[in-house]
Amino acid sequence: MASAVVSMVSTTASRFALLKVDSSSDSDSEKARGTHTSGKAHSGSAARGKTNVNEKKKEKRRKKKEQQQSEANELRNLAFKKIPPKASLGVSAAVQEHITHTVPKDAQKEDWQQWQQRDKQLTSDMFEADLEKALILSKLEYEESKVNGDGVNGVPQSKKVNKKDKRKNNQGKDKPLTVPLKDFQLEDQQAKKQEELKSPALPQGSGFFNKVEDDVTKIILNEKRKEHSTDVTESFATPEYSTEPALKDGKTEVLKQEIEKKEIALQQMRSKISQWEAKYREVKARNSQLLKMLQEGEMKDKAEILLQVDELLSIKNELTLQVTTLHAALEQERSKVKVLQAEQVRYQGGKKSKRNPELEHGR
């Protein structure tokens, strides 16, 4: 049936057969040619036609995929300013010309060189900074190990730490861990100092490491002084040291006399202070009385002024009433005058009308 239908249909040449076609439309032209040849050749089975159509569809899909991939690669190269490939399988000539016109090769090379230089600078700077940090940390650890190595009574610091860890482990089985206040404060101080040393920017130069060593020695000396001061205060807090010194040879009597004199002077000063306080209270009372008197006088003046204002307001109201009454009377008189004038005009008009017929009869 299919072959009969194909043989019955008349095929004609297309108007667009002479035009050039891109790679994307090759499959369509091949399909058109296939239909043209199939129309000419009346012999052929339906199975061969179906297989040809399927193969053409597969080729078309494959070409479309290749074209999409090539376009995506070109867009990536344009976005990252890379040199595009010289030849691509499914790319059209127009797209390649557009790419070559938009992105010149010299600009691409210059951009690539700039990126390489920046990358090298960044990596070198990071490497130098990491090296300086590592050197500083190693020196600090070495100085701390030196200072802590000179332990008290010939016991090194590592053994002390091990003993403390053992005690803590033994205590943790029976009781909760208790950290002394000194150790806690020292740990906090050391942590803060390490953070301060790490945080600032690392200067460059040969004298930098000498400065770091000086800072470390200063910090260690300050810590030793603090420990010494705490030990001294604890030793003085013991009952062995009495606050009252044992003075002899009449020094106690002299001190007692001086104390008595100072007590007498204090009593005199207290009496003077009490007198001044009494005087201050009297002055305060007088000032309060004066304030009351002034306030009363001001209130009286204000009351008189208010009374005068009330009287003036009442007079004003009376005058306004009189003015309103007079104005009403004036309006009434004006209306009366207008009425009289109108009557007068009417009367005069009547007289003139009477005179006119008399004159006519006389003539």
Curated annotation (Swiss-Prot):
InterPro entries documented for this protein: GKAP1
GO biological process, one term: signal transduction
Main localization of the protein described in the UniProt heading: Golgi
Coiled coil among keywords: yes
Basic residues: compositionally biased ranges: 160-170
Compartments, record wording: Golgi apparatus
UniProt region (Disordered), positions on chain: 17-79, 147-182
Top-level lineage group: Eukaryota
UniProt keywords, alphabetically: Coiled coil, Golgi apparatus
Any GO CC annotation of this UniProt entry: Golgi apparatus
Record has Signal as a keyword: no
Coiled-coil stretches noted in the UniProt entry, renumbered to this chain: 50-79, 249-298, 328-348
PANTHER family, per the entry: G KINASE ANCHORING PROTEIN 1, G KINASE-ANCHORING PROTEIN 1
Biological role stated in the UniProt entry: May play a role in the regulation of insulin-dependent IRS1 tyrosine phosphorylation in adipocytes.
Family statement drawn from the similarity comment of this UniProt entry: Belongs to the GKAP1 family.
Protein name in UniProt: G kinase-anchoring protein 1-B
Source species of the chain: Xenopus laevis
